[in-house]
Amino acid sequence: MDFSTLFRTKENLSLDKNTLTILRYIAIIGQILAISIVFYYLNLPFPIIESYLIISMGLATNLYLQFGIKINQLKDFYAAPFLLIDLLQLSALLYLTGGIFNPFSFLLIIPTIVSSTFLSMGTTIILGFITSILLLTISFFHLPLPGEDMNLLHFPNFYKIGIIISILIGLIFLSYFGIRFAG
C-alpha cells in the first residue's frame, strides 16, 4: 500500500451535499422521536432538555450545511467535519442515555461507513479511530440507561465487552466493504 495516496481522493469520490443533508435530517428526526417516546410515552427519566439541546446543535449544523455551503459535491475537506460533528453529537446523546447499553449505540459507526463509501481512505481511518475512542469512552463513562437506575435492567461486564467488540467488528467490516467496493 502506498501511504502517500491515503488522503487523496479520486475525482469521482465525493459526497453529494443533498444526500448528506437528507441522511442528517433522518437522524435528527429519529433522535427526536426516540427520546420523546422514551421520556413521554415510557415515562423513563433522563436529561431530556440536554438531549434536545444536543439534537438542536445537529439541526443547526445541518441547516448550515444545507444553506451555507454553496458547493454540491463535498470532498473530504467539507464532508469530514460534518461527519465528525455527527459522531460527537451522537456520542453526547449516548452519554446521556446509557452509553453503549442504549440500543441505538450501533449507529455510532454510520459516519465512518458513509466516509468509507464516499471519501478517502485516510479520512475513513481517522473517523474510524475517533469512533473507536468515542465508543470506548461511552462504554465506561455514561449516565444510566433510562430505567436502569430503577433496577429494571442489569448488565454484566461480559455483555458490555461483547457490545464493544461487536460494534468495532461492524465498524471495521463495513468500512472495509465501503472502501473496497465503492467508487
Segments the model singles out, each with a brief description of its role:
Residues 32-37, 63, 91-95, 113-114, ...:
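Alpha-helical transmembrane segments of multipass membrane proteins
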Residues 89-101, 106-126:
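Generic transmembrane alpha-helix motif of multi-pass integral membrane proteins
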Residues 16, 62-71:
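C-terminal ends of transmembrane helices
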Residues 1-15:
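Short, Lys/Arg-rich, polar N-terminal cytosolic tail immediately upstream
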Residues 22-32, 81-89:
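Alpha-helical transmembrane segments
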Residues 17, 29, 33-55, 71-81, ...:
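Alpha-helical transmembrane segments and their interfaces in multipass membrane proteins
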Residues 52-60, 84-88, 103-111, 161, ...:
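Membrane-embedded alpha-helical segments of multi-pass membrane proteins
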Residues 11-26:
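N-terminal membrane topogenic signal
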